[in-house]
Design a protein with these regions (language model features):
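Active-site activation/catalytic loop segments of kinase-like enzymes and analogous catalytic loops
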Residues: 60-97, 111-130
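Conserved active-site segments centered on acidic
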Residues: 45
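Regulatory N- and C-terminal appendages and interdomain linkers associated
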Residues: 126-160
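Activation of the activation-loop gatekeeper triad in protein kinase-fold domains
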Residues: 49-54
């Protein structure tokens, strides 16, 4: 697979303009989104799944991943298909006790878009190499990269 110009531009941007220091270091899930949560139907989260990317870092990384437009379920501005973005940010602020620095959020949003693009590409590679036959992996290589590339381009345009 060939290098992707929009991803290369994003990586250059991330390297040239690192985020401000984290307000605090915390456990970062790495794939924090509604698809990895179990809840009771009344708004209480019961469990969080899929911890293979967990590490210590800036909690804004998880927030940026959860707010990536790739998870909006075709409802622009709706975080993870659940809440309006502003409401999701207010809930996060209230429960984390942290501010959401707009400069840091833009960095983490772009970082997570690049991370997502890498995930979709590697999942598709597993499918085309014949290692796995799950059709979700084929979808990962067909639709998600195109959408993520458009998201990255829009993010870069907003940073210019």
């Amino acid at each position: 697979m060939a290098p992707i110009p929009v991803v290369r531009a994003a990586i250059r941007r991330l390297r040239a303009h690192p985020p401000p220091p984290a307000q605090r270091i915390a456990i970062v899930h790495g794939d924090y989104r509604s698809g990895n949560m179990m809840h009771d139907g009344a708004g209480r989260m019961l469990a969080m799944f899929d911890w293979e990317m967990a590490h210590l870092g800036d909690p804004l990384e998880d927030l940026g991943w959860a707010l990536d437009p790739i998870w909006d379920h075709f409802q622009p501005g709706i975080a993870c298909g659940m809440l309006p973005r502003d409401e999701a940010l207010a809930v996060w602020r209230a429960h984390s006790g942290l501010d959401v620095d707009p400069v840091a959020m833009r960095w983490w949003a772009l970082f997570n878009s690049v991370k997502g693009r890498a995930i979709w590409t590697s999942a598709y590679r597993e499918f085309i190499d014949g290692g796995r036959t799950d059709p979700v992996l084929a979808f990962s290589g067909w639709y998600l990269p195109r959408r993520q590339d458009a998201i990255i381009a829009a993010q870069l345009e907003g940073l210019a």
